[in-house]
Amino acid sequence: DFLKDRAYPVIREAVRFYLGYLTEYDGYLVTCPSTSPENCFLDRKGEKHSVTFASTMDISILKELFATYLQICKILKVDVLEKETEFALKKLPPFKIGHDGQLQEWYRDYRETDIHHRHVSHLYGLYPGNVIKETDQELKKACEISLNRRGSQGTGWCMVWKASLWARLKNG
């Protein structure tokens, strides 16, 4: 059985790794260090950085990973790491809406150095992930604002991703 013999062991070990990697900050479990691929931000002093903690992409992937793992545990009737995973999933930070109404790319509401950057990694939770639900109008609106801010520039692969995001928003 693929789920039991192949997928479960790989996903279980990914969960085990991240349970050990997460660190507590501000009452949440966060990834640290963390980046949003190829994008940078300005700190309060106006200095450019790329490394911080709890990027939205990281948190999106972990929410999806942990939820998937818990579903697999129920299907296979196993409970290895189940309680720890349930706890960690509840302790991941919520998605945040930033200063311009966009989905924040990082835990803090930093200013991007390039708002038109081709990467939309912080929208992973909408697509290809599924942790931003169709019923969550506030987050969907924030994703739409993020897409509009980024614009339509980019290379082939990111244009396909943006088109898929628009389709997920039922606006493609």
Give a label for each model feature.
Residues 1, 5-9, 13, 55-172:
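Active-site core of glycosidic bond-cleaving carbohydrate-active enzymes
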Residues 13-72:
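Acidic/histidine-rich catalytic neighborhood
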